[in-house]
C-alpha cells in the first residue's frame, strides 16, 4: 500500500507533468499550429497535431535518462507469445507476483543471471537481440496499444531545452546496436557502445505484486 507521502508526491509529479506538456505544446504551436495535448492512457502519444495527425511522445527529464516503458511480465510474455524455457527465464529473472522463485535466496523474490542456468540466459539474450526492433516498437514507438508516434521530444526540465527526434532515426540506432546482460539488468548499447536502454525488474513500491516484478525500461540520451 502506498504511503500518503508517496501519493502526494505522485499527484504533484502528475501536476508538473501536465504543466510541462502544455509548455512544450505551446512551443510546438509557435512553429506549426494545430498541436494539442493528447495524453490518452496506455499510449505513447502525449501531443498530437490535429491538422496533420503527426504525434509526439514527450520525455520530461532532469537527468540523461528516464523511464520509457513499464509492463508486467505476464503482459510482456503474452504480447510477444513467449512460452516454454524462455518464459521460465522471464519468471526467474523478473520474479512471479506472490511467489518466491528464489526459495529464500533473495529479498526481491527473483534470481539474477549468475543464479540461472547459462543455457536459459543465452536463450533469453538471443531473443532480445533477435527482437530488438520489435522491442523498440513497443517501448518507444507504439506501446502495446498500436498508437504509434512520429517523434520523441526530449524536454530538459532544469534548462527548458527542447529537442525533437524522428522515431525512425532512433530505430536506426537500434538496428546497429545490441542487448547485453549483466547480473541484475540488461542494457542496450548502440554501435558506439553508448547505453541507449536499460531494463530492470522494477523492484520498488508495494512488494511482490505485478508492478513490483514488472519490466521497467529506461531510455538514455545517447542521440
Where do the protein language model's features map onto the residues?
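Nucleic-acid endonuclease domains
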Residues: 1-45, 49-51, 58-223
Amino acid at each position: 500500500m502506498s504511503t500518503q507521502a508517496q501519493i502526494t508526491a505522485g499527484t504533484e509529479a502528475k501536476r508538473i507533468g501536465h504543466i510541462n506538456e502544455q509548455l512544450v505544446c505551446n512551443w510546438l504551436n509557435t512553429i506549426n499550429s494545430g498541436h494539442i495535448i493528447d495524453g490518452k492512457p496506455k499510449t505513447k502519444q502525449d501531443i498530437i497535431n490535429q491538422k496533420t495527425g503527426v504525434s509526439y511522445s514527450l520525455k520530461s527529464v532532469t537527468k540523461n535518462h528516464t523511464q520509457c516503458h513499464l509492463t508486467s511480465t505476464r503482459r510482456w510474455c503474452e504480447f510477444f507469445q513467449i512460452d516454454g524455457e524462455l518464459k521460465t527465464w522471464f519468471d526467474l529473472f523478473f520474479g512471479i507476483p506472490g511467489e518466491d522463485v528464489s526459495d529464500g535466496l533473495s529479498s526481491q523474490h527473483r534470481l539474477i543471471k549468475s543464479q540461472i542456468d547459462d543455457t536459459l540466459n543465452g536463450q533469453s539474450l538471443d531473443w532480445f537481440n533477435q527482437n530488438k526492433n520489435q522491442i523498440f516498437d513497443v517501448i518507444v514507438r507504439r506501446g502495446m496499444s498500436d498508437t504509434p508516434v512520429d517523434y520523441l521530444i526530449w524536454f530538459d526540465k532544469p534548462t527548458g531545452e527542447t529537442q525533437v527526434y524522428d522515431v525512425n532515426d532512433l530505430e536506426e540506432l537500434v538496428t546497429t546496436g545490441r542487448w547485453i546482460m549483466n547480473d541484475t539488468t540488461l542494457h542496450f548499447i548502440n554501435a558506439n557502445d553508448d547505453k541507449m536502454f536499460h531494463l530492470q525488474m522494477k523492484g520498488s513500491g508495494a512488494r511482490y505484486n505485478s508492478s513490483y516484478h514488472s519490466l521497467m525500461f529506461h531510455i538514455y540520451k545517447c542521440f
